[in-house]
Swiss-Prot record:
CDD domains: FN3, R-PTP-C-2, R-PTPc-C-1. GO terms for biological process: alpha-beta T cell proliferation; B cell differentiation; B cell proliferation; B cell receptor signaling pathway; bone marrow development; cell cycle phase transition; cell surface receptor signaling pathway; defense response to virus. Residues 391-483, 484-576 form the Fibronectin type-III domain. This is Receptor-type tyrosine-protein phosphatase C. GO terms for cellular component: bleb; cell surface; cytoplasmic side of plasma membrane; external side of plasma membrane; extracellular exosome; focal adhesion; membrane; membrane microdomain. The lineage of its organism: Eukaryota, Metazoa, Chordata, Craniata, Vertebrata.
Length: 1306
């Protein structure tokens, strides 16, 4: 046994001495069997757990003894003691292959650093689309689960750094070269290390030679308890956040439930941790020994303090994605410990903000992001972002070209990519116009282009997404076709010598063609004498005739079309070189002419009693020569021509009128001059021509029985349509009715009154209603009906002839009563209205229309001229007034006697051409109004709107000096509503006490208005009523400082009824001062006593008693305040307003009363609103329209409104007010079966008078109701017919006016 121990000790010693067989764990010399070493991967991130390690053992040493036996001993390497392997040493750990085959190097697993390494030093990374478009793939090994305690496993889309367990494979070396017979001994060695219990079991086989060979060595390890600090060295923690408590919970990632020392942890969770605070946790478990693991919990900031924000710019949103973490709240954590991480596809970025560019439009991209604090993730978010629409493609233009001078067309194919609409721009020189087109269009027609102009067209599609993106534009161009150029302008004609002219003009503003050429045509009369063309508009015309009128026409030619010529008239001068010879010749001729004239005067005086026809032959040759060549006027330029001729005090009208011979001497006048006929003529010089006089039937034994002062007059293309006659004298009344019977006339138009200005104008040739029937020779006349209207009187007569058995005939007698004593009617519409009435009674089977005034030439010719020319205007769309008046003079001398009548014909034609027929019968009103409101097409205004637009505004047509004076401006409530001077209501300072002085003052006209004191001004105007002019007053609502003037006006003008159409206030704004009070109130000299107040649902009636301080008598004034009418609106209940109007009319004087015929003395009605125009205008219009409807069963709303606008500014100023008048009248007079249904209060209004007034009067021989006083410029004395002395003899007419004053003749 002792020997055995020594042998064993000796073998152990040799083992230490044998350096060849000493093996360590890291031998630099490869084993004889070719053992290789594989280097393991690098250490993982600090956030990952440290790997488990395996202790490597050294191979056993083999000793051979000489005494033929061997022994195998296994010894531990000195390095295999209790030692913890550091991470650095693990990188160099070797792995051994026990099979003796060379090991293969372990492949390197992909890491975040392998896929994409972010650049350092920036918070934002930008990547191109080639990398961004890669598909997100899971990272291998990222989801591996470790069985080793303390290791963590976290599921994430992000790849984690791989951790490979470090393993060393040990291969034992054999140093004996011979195989000995086996002698086996079993030895077990147990060694305690820090890591494990090593149990070694060895079997020793002795060879026959006595050497011992170790054949097999088996080592078994039994694990011992590690320390808790070691076991949980790599423990990981997840932080869970509670948004309600704003506290964290730390979850310890271990497989067993551990204890946390002083801190309580439940299910491995530590609760109620505050953000950005540190907490220490001592971890222990019964599977490990002391010391415990001390874990420092570094709590991250709160999750709600971070927000993932889309920072993509909308302009780049089609190809760019931008994501950014924003800190929406502050925190105390160290921001350097925060890591932001994004993963988009297979790209990973550690940045707070990322931006991906060059992406595809309209694609979805997903990006995941997380935030780590000290390498511990505590929040994450995902975003799916769709890129915006991209810019559309470029459309393909098929063609673009000019279709005409003002039109072009472009067609195209739309782009392939999606878009919303097109934008088409067309550029002309420096001007650019763009318009949006619908996406479905592939063609567009361009209108209103400028001729012969190059247009560059640009067409692009656009799409409206987050912003509007325009696609590429397709371009094309074309040049429009040529068109006629515009007119040259600023043309001048100047004389360079007596017969030479220099003509210049400016180029046209629109040439519209390829070439430039100016042409000048020179005409003398109707003969073309020169035709020149130059490149510039500069002509020198020489060698013209002296003292000749020339017409110069200059126009521009663009190579394709001529322009409109600019026309000027100029005359050459006389030949100054022959001036002396001409003067000498003139003296001689003048002397001869003087001698001839003296001789003729002597001869005429000597032969005064000779036949007057011989005298006419002396001037016959001059009748036609003095006529002018006046062209007919087309309807389109009728108004412009009238304005041109009326300018400069009507100089052109006067020239035309004076060129017409008053009497054409070539037509003999014998019958009228015979002695037995001279007494039948009212005027000795107004006689009918023999060739067309009206011849009566002969009465046996009565010389001249076939004569009457009347002439046949041709109408427009209708021979003998009229008979123009003088007003019958008492001696010729029987002849007049004989003419009516024989000529089968059914209509008589009387354009005069029996007496005018205390002068007899015409005999009363019909019976009165009281008389009933009267015989005029053989003709018996019976009056059946008598109807009085404001401007005319219609009488229905029945005539029979005693000597004939024929039945009686109906004759309509129409007397126009509104022709003033002097001058002509101011409103030509009155004559158009008369014409409508006459034509309503005339028919195809009637004889000629008999028209007469006093002499049968002036007013008669005017009416016939208007009637005939209106027929021509309707038939040919042009009129030849001058030519027709010449024709009238050839058929009856002095027809259209004065220039004012000649102008009146033109005015009536202009009125008709501009405004047309606007009068409507009540029976036709409803279908008429229905058609007037139709829009055809819907885009155009309705006929009713067009009619309103034709209404003249009459702004500033008369002066408004008084109301605009500085001292009177404060008396106007509305500066836009100032009364015109011509019809304003003047006030007197004091009321004259005597009736005579009062009468004189009341009769004063407005002519002195301009000279009155400022205190005499009040904002009020006289308004034309239906029955007489200026019997109404339209006034503004009184101001506080004008209440006294308001009552003065009411007292001076004897107002009986006040109509108040306004409240006192509108909101907080005063619109009318309260001009009355309870009981008695004194305003200056006027005492106003409120006697009674009666309120109804529609209006309030107040009764005032007025007294003047210098008068004893009192007056009663009624005030009707209509309260259901808001400012600037229409009446809420029109029927209530109509009802009040009917009540008001009952308080006014009747139309035939003597009081109602006084002009300006009594204006019984005053209407006011806020400014005296808005509501007042509607009220006045309705009052006049109701009177017209009740009297004539017709309404003319257009003319009523036009008259109101002429009387006061702002009357019926809107279309809504205009249409309201139509609607109210239509609802007031409903139609049933084509007949107008009258209300009860109307039944007695529209009827013929069946009895004469008690005081005998010539119903048609008095002044017209309320004939207006004329302004000074209208009060011209007539130079017409003046009767001679004696009532029996004929009268004499001065042959027309000697000056261009506008006079009236007959």
């Amino acid at each position: 046994m002792t020997m055995y121990l020594w042998l064993k000790l000796l073998a152990f010693g040799f083992a230490f001495l044998d350096t060849e067989v000493f093996v360590t764990g890291q031998s630099p010399t490869p084993s004889p069997t070719g053992l290789t070493t594989a280097k393991m991967p690098s250490v993982p991130l600090s956030s990952d757990p440290l790997p488990t390690h395996t202790t490597a053992f050294s191979p056993a040493s083999t000793f051979e003894r000489e005494n033929d036996f061997s022994e195998t001993t296994t010894s531990l390497s000195p390095d295999n003691t209790s030692t913890q392997v550091s991470p650095d040493s693990l990188d160099n750990a070797s792995a051994f292959n026990t099979t003796g085959v060379s090991s293969v190097q372990t492949p390197h697993l992909p890491t975040h650093a392998d896929s994409q390494t972010p650049s350092a030093g920036t918070d934002t990374q930008t990547f191109s689309g080639s990398a961004a478009n890669a598909k997100l793939n899971p990272t291998p090994g990222s989801n591996a689960i470790s069985d080793v305690p303390g290791e963590r496993s976290t599921a994430s889309t992000f790849p984690t750094d791989p951790v490979s367990p470090l393993t060393t494979t040990l291969s034992l070396a054999h140093h004996s070269s011979a195989a000995l017979p086996a002698r086996t001994s079993n030895t077990t060695i147990t060694a305690n290390t820090s890591d494990a219990y090593l149990n070694a079991s060895e079997t020793t086989t002795l060879s026959p030679s006595g050497s011992a060979v170790i054949s097999t060595t088996t080592i078994a390890t039994t694990p011992s308890k590690p320390t808790c600090d070691e076991k949980y060295a790599n423990i990981t923690v997840d932080y869970l956040y509670n948004k309600e408590t704003k506290l964290f919970t730390a979850k310890l990632n271990v497989n067993e439930n551990v204890e946390c020392g002083n801190n309580t942890c439940t299910n491995n969770e530590v609760h109620n941790l505050t953000e950005c605070k540190n907490a220490s946790v001592s971890i222990s478990h019964n599977s490990c020994t002391a010391p415990d693991k001390t874990l420092i919990l570094d709590v991250p900031p709160g999750v709600e303090k971070f927000q993932l924000h889309d920072c993509t710019q909308v302009e780049k949103a089609d190809t760019t994605i931008c994501l950014k973490w924003k800190n929406i709240e502050t925190f105390t954590c160290d921001t350097q410990n925060i890591t932001y991480r994004f993963q988009c596809g297979n790209m990973i970025f550690d940045n707070k903000e990322i931006k991906l560019e060059n992406l595809e439009p309209e694609h979805e991209y997903k990006c995941d992001s997380e935030i780590l604090y000290n390498n511990h993730k505590f929040t994450n978010a995902s975003k799916i972002i769709k890129t915006d629409f991209g810019s559309p493609g470029e459309p393909q233009i098929i063609f673009c070209r000019s279709e005409a001078a003002h039109q072009g067309v472009i067609t195209w194919n739309p782009p392939q990519r999606s878009f919303h609409n097109f934008t088409l721009c067309y550029i002309k020189e420096t001007e650019k116009d763009c318009l949006n087109l619908d996406k479905n269009l592939i063609k567009y027609d361009l209108q209103n282009l400028k001729p012969y102009t190059k247009y560059v067209l640009s067409l692009h599609a656009y799409i409206i997404a987050k912003v509007q993106r325009n696609g590429s534009a397709a371009m094309c161009h074309f040049t429009t076709k040529s068109a006629p150029p515009s007119q040259v302008w600023n043309m001048t004609v100047s004389m360079t010598s007596d017969n030479s002219m220099h003509v210049k003009c400016r180029p046209p503003r629109d040439r519209n063609g390829p070439h430039e050429r100016y042409h000048l045509e020179v005409e003398a009369g109707n003969t073309l004498v020169r035709n020149e063309s130059h490149k510039n508009c500069d002509f020198r015309v020489k060698d013209l005739q002296y003292s000749t009128d020339y017409t110069f026409k200059a126009y521009f030619h663009n190579g394709d079309y001529p322009g409109e010529p600019f026309i000027l008239h100029h005359s050459t001068s006389y030949n100054s070189k022959a001036l002396i010879a001409f003067l000498a010749f003139l003296i001689i001729v003048t002397s001869i002419a003087l001698l001839v004239v003296l001789y003729k005067i002597y001869d005429l005086h000597k032969k005064r009693s000779c036949n007057l026809d011989e005298q006419q032959e002396l001037v016959e040759r001059d009748d036609e020569k003095q006529l002018m060549n006046v062209e007919p006027i087309h309807a389109d330029i009728l108004l412009e021509t009238y304005k041109r001729k009326i300018a400069d005090e009507g100089r052109l009208f006067l020239a035309e009128f004076q060129s017409i011979p008053r009497v054409f001497s070539k037509f003999p006048i014998k019958e009228a001059r015979k002695p037995f006929n001279q007494n039948k003529n009212r005027y000795v010089d107004i006689l009918p021509y023999d060739y067309n006089r009206v011849e009566l039937s002969e009465i046996n034994g009565d010389a001249g029985s076939n004569y009457i002062n009347a002439s046949y007059i041709d109408g427009f293309k209708e021979p003998r349509k009229y008979i123009a006659a003088q007003g019958p004298r008492d001696e010729t009344v029987d002849d007049f009715w004989r003419m009516i019977w024989e000529q089968k006339a059914t209509v008589i138009v009387m354009v005069t009154r029996c007496e005018e200005g205390n002068r007899n104008k015409c005999a009363e040739y019909w019976p009165s209603m009281e008389e009933g029937t009267r015989a005029f020779g053989d003709v018996v006349v019976k009056i059946n009906q008598h109807k009085r209207c404001p401007d005319y009187i219609i009488q229905k007569l029945n005539i029979v002839n005693k000597k004939e058995k024929a039945t009686g005939r109906e004759v309509t007698h129409i007397q126009f009563t509104s022709w003033p004593d002097h001058g002509v009617p101011e409103d030509p519409h009155l004559l158009l209205k008369l014409r409508r009435r006459v034509n309503a009674f005339s028919n195809f089977f009637s004889g000629p229309i008999v028209v007469h005034c006093s002499a049968g030439v002036g007013r008669t010719g005017t009416y016939i001229g208007i009637d005939a020319m209106l027929e021509g205007l309707e038939a040919e769309n042009k009129v030849d007034v001058y030519g027709y008046v010449v024709k009238l003079r050839r058929q009856r001398c002095l027809m259209v006697q004065v220039e004012a009548q000649y102008i009146l014909i033109h005015q009536a034609l202009v009125e008709y051409n501009q405004f047309g027929e606007t009068e409507v019968n009540l029976s036709e009103l409803h279908p008429y109004l229905h058609n007037m409101k139709k829009r055809d097409p819907p885009s155009e205004p309705s006929p009713l709107e067009a009619e309103f637009q034709r209404l003249p505004s009459y702004r500033s047509w008369r002066t408004q000096h008084i109301g605009n004076q500085e001292e009177n401006k404060s008396k106007n409530r509305n500066s836009n509503v100032i009364p015109y001077d011509y019809n304003r209501v003047p006030l007197k300072h004091e009321l004259e006490m005597s009736k005579e002085s009062e009468h004189d003052s009341d009769e004063s006209s407005d002519d002195d208005s301009d000279s009155e004191e400022p205190s005499k001004y009040i904002n009020a105007s006289f308004i034309m009523s239906y029955w007489k002019p200026e019997v109404m007053i339209a006034a503004q609502g009184p101001l506080k400082e004008t209440i006294g003037d308001f009552w003065q006006m009411i007292f001076q003008r004897k107002v009986k009824v006040i109509v108040m159409l306004t409240e006192l206030k509108h909101g907080d704004q005063e619109i009318c001062a309260q001009y009355w009070g309870e009981g008695k109130q004194t305003y200056g000299d006027i005492e106003v006593d409120l006697k009674d107040t009666d309120k109804s649902s529609t209006y309030t009636l107040r009764v005032f008693e007025l007294r003047h301080s210098k008068r004893k008598d009192s007056r009663t004034v009624y005030q009707y305040q209509y309260t259901n009418w808001s400012v600037e609106q229409l009446p809420a209940e029109p029927k209530e307003l109509i009802s009040m109007i009917q009540v008001v009319k009952q308080k006014l004087p009747q139309k035939n009363s003597s009081e109602g015929n006084k002009h300006h003395k009594s204006t019984p009605l005053l209407i006011h609103c806020r400014d005296g125009s808005q509501q007042t205008g509607i009220f006045c219009a309705l009052l006049n329209l109701l009177e017209s409807a009740e009297t004539e069963e017709v309404v003319d709303i257009f003319q009523v409104v036009k008259a109101l606008r002429k009387a006061r500014p702002g009357m019926v100023s809107t279309f809504e007010q205009y249409q309201f008048l139509y609607d109210v009248i239509a609802s007031t007079y409903p139609a049933q079966n084509g007949q107008v249904k009258k209300n009860n209060h109307q039944e007695d209004k529209i009827e013929f008078d069946n009895e004469v007034d008690k005081v005998k009067q010539d119903a048609n021989c008095v002044n017209p109701l309320g004939a207006p006083e004329k302004l000074p410029e209208a009060k011209e004395q007539a130079e017409g017919s003046e009767p001679t002395s004696g009532t029996e003899g004929p009268e004499h007419s001065v042959n027309g006016p000697a000056s261009p004053a506008l006079n009236q003749g007959s």
